[in-house]
Amino acid sequence: MDFSHKAIEKKWQKYWKENNIYKTTNNSEKKAYILDMFPYPSGAGLHVGHIKGYTATDVYSRFKRMQGYDVLHPIGWDAFGLPAEQYALKTGNDPREFTLQNIENFKIQLNKMGFSYDYDKEINTADPNYYKTTQWIFKQLYKKGLAENRDIDVNWCQELGTVLANDEIIEKDGLMVSERGEYPVVKKKMRQWVLKITDYADKLLDGLDNLDWPNSVKELQRNWIGKSEGCEINFKSNDINIPVFTTRADTIFGVTYIVLASENELVLKLTAPEKLEEVKKYIELTANKSEIERKDESRTKTGVFIGSYATNPLTKEQIQIWISDYVLNDYGSGAIMAVPAHDKRDWDFAAKFNLPIKFVIQTKDQSKAFVGEGIHINSEFLNDLDRIQALQVIHDYVDKNNLGKRKINYKLRDWLFSRQRFYGEPFPVLYDKDNNIVLIEDNNLPITLPITDYIKPTNTGESPLANVKNWVNVKIGDKEYKRETNTMPQSAASSWYFIAYILANSKNNLIDLTSDEAKKRLEKWLPVDLYIGGQEHAVGHLLYARFWTHFLYDLGLLPTNEPFKRLFNQGMILGPDNRKMSKSWGNVINPDDVIDTHGADALRLYEMFMGPLDASLPWSFDGLDASLKWLNRCYRMINKIEFSNTNNHKLDYVYNDVVKKVTQMIQELKFNTAISQLMVLVNAIYKEELNTVYKPYIEGFVKMLSLFAPHLSEELWEKLGNNSSVTLQTWPEFDETKIIKNAVVIALQVNGKLRSTIEVEKGTDKETLIKLAQENENIIRFIKDHKNLKYIAVVDRIVNIVIE
């Protein structure tokens, strides 16, 4: 007899909700804060790929509850975002209404899966009660000099009508396009809010060392921050100083030209009049190229000589000044000293434009750039020195002669923090008639979005909010002000949402971050103990969240400077065709359909059993069928067998061994192998005689199964005569003494040669060993045609059959 998943799921979901089974407790000194990367509530809803990560955190949360931990396992909604705004533009509907509808659909889907979220902790980043604190944190950043309004080169997307951050852009066919919609993106100078994350570069680097994160993610962040130690050397062109950052100042005697990024503010100042038109055309051409294309070393180099020269401060040689797209303005000073003999890109450029090449590091092969280690040559006082020696000497020389200075440089850029959108957090900022910035008082927060039909982009670079004049214009006393009309990026809210869950008393009801109660809660729950989500957030959300946590820690508001103690990146679930799930491929699997046909427990079990949690694997309906088949086997086992309260000890070894292994495997997030162990236990139980299976062992099995199949496990727990939720039970213990295996392996030999082995209980007598050897299939093949056999048996060791 199989179980009815539809009846069971409804029954127990109702029970969990009515009895508030998953409410966060505050009874233990042990805590476990287990967190999903919260979803953006899109209109498409969830697919089975989303379910994988959520199931993993749910399994671990249930495990920790049963181990006696207070568990915080919340859910919320990253609700601001461009998709809702685009929907509103197409339909004329308010994006807030659209978002709330999507949230309700998401909640229905999540509840169907039996996830153990505490909905009293639910948050919505687009709710004013939430973004009141987002606005307050921005104010603190501004007060500490970490938020600035400045004119900068930005990534402008005309189609979306907004500025995009670097992590919101991808490269396609050599051009910059928006990640969402793949619309063209160009560089444009605009006045924007930025957060000075660069001030925290060293703290963010140092903090990575002690995090239990995948090395790949930590390395991505290290490379994104990109710390390099070097020297900034001043080259002069007439009276204009050109600062050049380099990590290889020791090669300065090999500099044969200088290259500026086309965006460098010195370009037009240095360009000769006769070259101005050509230079401007090249600058315009470069603006449409992606950073990825510009960094591509394999492509043909392009550039323009600007008609001016600079002086090498050491050799006093006059060298040409060029602009080229292979030099980026946002690294160093946006200028390089070109040493073509020892840099491949410089070599390719020099070869293309027939520029001089001078070797200053000894090499036998001067037919290509030499980038290895060697002794310096053609370098005056650096001759015969190796790289490390030469760097020390040249840095001292530059310092002593005021030719530059030692400098640490970072690839990390300040965080572009404003968007020309309607649907985002308003800034708590006013401008007076002289354009001075005035912060809105705390007691006037939150500043909410207006109810308006004017949400179309202005196409002037301003936010749609600029159209809402009765919102923009503010009068306080006899003074008139204008509101900031840009809104914050979606990444603002996600930079502190893990804190918001702790502050939540009930849905979207947050206590003050600065209160004594907040301090008490934060000290208990932070940092997050396990955070599961995709690696694609490595240099976006994960970096920004670390920055805000470090900042709030420095304000004395948090007990830790790192938000996420342990991070795990789950793999993707691919379509049955082994491609990424996509509507365009037609390979998306809807969990609602799977739940209808197979049930939530089968879906949960299958996704955790299909392979290692961090592996990306294709969806298989055969695997799903097998999971349901096994759950039915578990159901039949408990309905079929009458259990005993007396232990006959036959299952002692396998039960205790399985409990020990499953406990360790769950802790290590090896869910697929944990499920395999449960299958081992079920097989062992089926081999036992009816009415002899020890009931506490069956109960221990159901407890372990409940992590993966909570609905069925509740039903089985009730069937065993229990009247409380299996979720609230303690995790099964194992007896180490029962795992000492009372068995030995006996070697079976024929004429002294090993032909087979058997496993028997220790102390098995000689007669039994000989009988088992005679029945062994491999041994039979060797002795079947012989009659004169002599058997030599040694207890616990060997049986040797001698053919006479």
UniProtKB/Swiss-Prot annotation:
GO terms for cellular component: cytosol. NCBIfam families: leuS_bact. This is Leucine--tRNA ligase. It is an enzyme of class 6 (ligase). It comes from the Bacteria. Its EC number is 6.1.1.4. Belongs to the class-I aminoacyl-tRNA synthetase family. The lineage of its organism: Bacteria, Bacillati, Mycoplasmatota, Mollicutes, Mycoplasmataceae. It comes from Mycoplasma mycoides subsp. mycoides SC (strain CCUG 32753 / NCTC 10114 / PG1). The gene is leuS. It holds the Pfam family tRNA-synt_1_2. HAMAP family: Leu_tRNA_synth_B. A motif ('HIGH' region) lies at residues 39-50. ATP binds at K583. Its main location: cytoplasm. GO terms for biological process: leucyl-tRNA aminoacylation. It is found in: Cytoplasm. It catalyses: tRNA(Leu) + L-leucine + ATP = L-leucyl-tRNA(Leu) + AMP + diphosphate. A motif ('KMSKS' region) lies at residues 580-584.
